[in-house]
Amino acid sequence: MKMNPQDLVAMKGCKRIAMLTAYTCPIARSIEEAGIPVILVGDTVGMVEMGFDTTRDVTIEHMEYHVGAVRRGAKNTHIIGDLPFGTDVDPQTALINATRLIEAGADSVKLEGPNTRVIEHLVDHDIPVVGHTGLLPQTAKTFKQVGRTAAEANRIALEAQAIEKAGAFMIVLEHIPHALAGEITKALSVPTIGIGAGADCDGQVLVINDALGLGDYWPPFSKQYAYVSKTVLKVAREFSEEVESMKFPSNIIQFTGTDKN
């Protein structure tokens, strides 16, 4: 049964929230079958699937396409759609683009930073919002941990409180000191989802490509549960060898069909 924002808020302090990203229908289908309650269709798709050097190249059209694909694979899972760079510059622009993601199949939208006017506007128009503070990939110059100085930690903590006050029902905390994430989590009444923010958050999110070991780089705070890139390489090499040696297709295997017309 698909969870709504109220269900997810009710999990705070009771049960940890597991979240994975997905960008395609087959992956989304497997994630739903595993019982993961939330899928994030992140703008990370630009870097891990589309070959961009930055998430800033991702467009709203890209996000609509991938949200739709994920929805077709996971009809009973709460799906969060990322608002890509430049699509939430003001409340009305954000509403137009958030509506596009909802119509594509998202149940809620996520946006980076303490843009409280935008969050309030979306919530006022019945669009559930997930906030995001700490490291903000859309505008960050480096991917180093943030919040290590007292001033920076205080700023991030205040941002999280402002995002909650504006109406977000959940907040992603990215690549900040674990102690800071724990303090923020205790101070908020909405769930926090950590990515590189330690075990004291209310839940955790991983980029599915990182979890699968698919690609050639994975953040140090991620975990690889498999190494799918090695499997793809093995399969491709075996296929090539069998084609060259005429082992594939096998003459033993015959496919027959019946014309029903």
Which sequence ranges carry the predicted segments?
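Alpha/beta enzyme core
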Residues: 2-226, 230-261
